[in-house]
């Protein structure tokens, strides 16, 4: 939740420009990836398959359109089915990973939608003509151990200034990495650590010469959670939050230990809140109290983290039918009092982590309901689109968290507004916030694609360019005139349903802004009809911020 991320990053491999939506001779709506000259979103009546397996529809369509996709071989040999589900509208949604001789192609995924036996949409970019890539013919000369050593040494020299204590070792896999119109054999190395500063770095190391092709910090990759639940009776305690407001919270009483614990057994697999005790070891100790009265000042951050995690769970369940962040009722774990004066909050892949702030720039981060909603939405994104935390896909990742963090705030009706982090940012300055969805320029963020940040700081502007999508979401909900474009608002509820459907069922790891527009248009058509006002409003909202 930094106002500006301080870490730079090399540009992501995928071309982020896409041509405006067009129509093929067959009546299909197509968005093109400008760099690779391949479709990144196709919708329409693509192919009817009768009684055959649904994945065969996708293989047949891609093979039929081989002149467009140019995979250089049979689709079934190049696309591996990695997931299949039925959504709320009865569509079958399948996700495929592109592979080359069995090696995954970094960042590629194809999401396919089948309705009543007919293929109606494909989203995601594929890399063409890999057989003709000369760099892929070079022999692998770098070992896994050497790649990991290169990444850790670079972290030491450029990030931590001392050798970090890594967690669970490094995770490394061999990939095909597309970059600058070419593709290379590379290692994807994940280096995770909590000290001396938290980091979750992704490195792309050329497997033929050891060069660092890309690197970025992404604090949301998988790592195991810790801490054990207690057996006992569900109870209701009372506490005071960071802002001094009283809250009733679900707790557990253990007669064996004689304590009350911040363990909520009423939601999914439980909500657990831990005391980090100003250290940097996770998860810490399950929060305890002797009388079920969590009213001490030290309790405040834990009270809010626990209570607001329950609100976020309820929002996703009651509004979107989603059971916890993974859709399967995963336990929600939060640690407060992480480090000393730590000015951040993050999702680490298995749990939430909240710093106390320094008291001047930030209050304890769990005191902002939109902050809690924001960070837990990163977990939802982690389990759905998996948006790469860099450049436009990273800005979409951040915008989704802002959008749903704000919608959670409205759901709870706790002084809701369109500002982000206003409750915990600069407590001595009235009316200040981290970002604004209604007026991104208020805090120096762009509100139109023509004003986007194009540098490498902040992972390519993930916290900056999110303002463009935030403004589109605000306009879609509330309506208005922006840069001379009139938008008819459809309300928060419909806006949220459209963005949720786009996130969960259409976006893929390297989706850019144009693909997000296409995904939202298709989501609105799915929900409200292709000729509906909602579809028109989505188009108006993205037109208003210059995204086509």
From Swiss-Prot:
Function comment: Extracellular zinc metalloprotease.
Cofactor(s) demanded: Ca(2+); Zn(2+)
Entry keyword set: Calcium, Hydrolase, Metal-binding, Metalloprotease, Protease, Secreted, Signal, Zinc, Zymogen
Enzyme Commission number(s) of this protein: 3.4.24.-
Temperature dependence: Thermostable. Retains about 80% of its activity after treatment of 65 degrees Celsius for 30 minutes.
Name recorded for this polypeptide: Thermostable neutral protease NprT
Activity regulation, short description: Its casein hydrolytic activity is inhibited almost completely by a chelating agent (EDTA), whereas neither diisopropyl fluorophosphate nor phenylmethylsulfonyl fluoride inhibit the proteolytic activity in vitro.
Note describing how the cofactor binds: Binds 4 Ca(2+) ions per subunit. Binds 1 zinc ion per subunit.
Keyword Protease among record annotations: yes
Cross-referenced InterPro entries: FTP_domain, PepSY, Peptidase_M4, Peptidase_M4/M1_CTD_sf, Peptidase_M4_C_domain, Peptidase_M4_domain, Zinc_Metalloprotease_M4
Primary location group: secreted
Gene Ontology terms describing biological process: proteolysis
One term under GO cellular component: extracellular region
Organism, as annotated: Geobacillus stearothermophilus
Molecular function GO terms recorded: metal ion binding; metalloendopeptidase activity
Subcellular location: Secreted
Family per similarity comment: Belongs to the peptidase M4 family.
A Pfam family annotated for this UniProt entry: Peptidase_M4
This protein's record includes keyword Zinc: yes
pH dependence: Optimum pH is about 7.
Signal peptide, first to last residue: 1-25
Active site positions: 375, 463 (proton donor)
Chain residues that bind Ca(2+) 2: 370, 409, 417, 419, 422
Binding residue positions for Ca(2+) 4: 425-426, 429, 432
Binding site for Zn(2+): 374, 378, 398
UniProt binding sites for Ca(2+) 1: 289, 291, 293
